[in-house]
Amino acid sequence: MPDDPVARLENTHRRMGDELTALEVAAHAGDRQGLDMALDFFASAAKRHHEDEEASLFPRLRGDAGLVPLLDGLASEHRDHEAARREIEELVRGNADTRAIAASVARFVAMLRAHIEKEDRELLPAAERMLDAETREAVAEEMRGRRRGR
């Protein structure tokens, strides 16, 4: 499928990894512009990615009772990521010490990298197994709609 939603999620994970690296580099260099750019990515594209998972993918996987704890845990982690991102933004806006920003970024990066690894190892393989072509197309359409502002 040309616009496969599972592949899109995987690709976003790769992009998130790149942005996490950029965020780390900017934090250690005290590069406020670099921090702002990476944080903007996590406030927009990564947030939309989490919406794709929670609104379109997770509900379709809840039919497998064994996945429910994973799905609930991942959704909770999404809230934690958002809180950690806001904390970094507040530190940057408040012109905090570079070390304080770097420490907050390090926590965020570790948290998000572990989350991505868990999704790649558990969530996405489950989606590959469980979603038929019709369901994949429905998920893909919902994801496209989010990008068109619907």
Regions found by a protein language model. Give the residues of each.
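Small-residue-biased structural context
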Residues: 1-150
